[in-house]
């Protein structure tokens, strides 16, 4: 009895199941457990050079849910500092960054809003935010936006962190607020006027926190 080519291949090819998701984060085990990080939710306000880097590093850490908010389009002058590239020029930053995050973790859940944080619909935040599982990250280089974001984070019992650089990277500024602790809000600590990058020199002392433990701290948001 003659055998077809298909019969030969059926015997020779052995398929093995491949756990893509588990393999992607296999090097994180014992440091950042996927089962913990996958439930975390991050709202990125401002998807520029800082916001895109923060989002991608959190995606690599295993964070499973993102809400990206930014009104801007990728332009050529963004490329030298942004995590997205020339192929993304002309598209919204939220779309370009979303593709990058999906390329790291195909199972990541992403919500997008084309606009500034002050215009984020409450219904969208209500659906996305989960108390003690959500963190707001302010990367808009705007104090008024960070003040507003911190107020929202308090409303949703979520942690808040603001990240920015002063003019010509003279210094970096990181502020964080964790609900339920005796900590000043952003407005009380830093005020609400101007852009962070417009600061040319320090006129008061701020906690400058550059640490590799930032992602690990996210696992303890509770």
How would you name each of these model-derived features?
Residues 33-63, 70-73:
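Glycine-rich adenosine-cofactor-binding loop
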Residues 1-9, 210-222:
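Single conserved hydrophobic/aromatic residue that forms the stacking wall/gate
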